[in-house]
Amino acid sequence: FIASLGAFSTFGIFGLYASLAPSFMGQMLPWHGPAVSGMSIAVILFLSAGVQWLARPLHTKTCVLWGLGLLALGNVWLMATTLSNWPVLFILSLLTTAAGHGLMNLAGIAIVNKVATPATRSGLLSTYLIVGYIGTIAPILAVGWLSDYTGLSWAIVAFCIFMSVFTSSLCWLAYQTPVIEPA
């Protein structure tokens, strides 16, 4: 449950950067163009992969707690960037989002592997990924719809508030959950 909702939030937060980067980065940063938006996405993915590699020895629950916490913080930084247009905050947002993204991807797959038996592994992994893919789609559609009424900046602020509260709540639930032993 927590792993799948973690995937939802992880994919949703990355989806915001990926799908709306050209639009909102043009408003927040003094630099423009496809290279800037492409660079932010590349930074998230490269740093995410690096964090996953470095975090391999960490306990899964540690990865979940830190990952969700960093995703919440990344949304706070992105909201602050949206309101202030300060590029340093955007860099902090990218770094914390990338670290949270990597930790949650590592932890999510690890949790699926821990709770699945050989007979249920493919179904559980598919379900986990489907929830993640819905997380890529639904929040972005909501931001697009909301931006028609409030403007893009306020839609991003609303997204950041929601995702910060959501990932913080998941972090608290994960903290309360006992450690999962392999099936």
Q: Where is each model-derived feature located?
A:
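Pair of pore-lining "gating" transmembrane helices in MFS-fold secondary transporters
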Residues: 1-14, 91, 95-96
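Small/hydrophobic positions within alpha-helical transmembrane segments
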Residues: 9, 39, 43, 47, ...
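Conserved extracellular-gate-facing transmembrane-helix segments in secondary transporters
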Residues: 9-18, 101, 136
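Loop-to-transmembrane helix entry
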Residues: 27-46, 123, 127
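Transmembrane alpha-helices of Major Facilitator/SLC transporters
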Residues: 36-60, 74
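C-terminal transmembrane helical hairpin of 12-TM major facilitator-type secondary transporters
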Residues: 62-106
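A late C-terminal transmembrane helix in Major Facilitator Superfamily
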Residues: 101, 109-152, 159-160
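Multi-pass alpha-helical transporter architecture, strongest
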Residues: 160-183
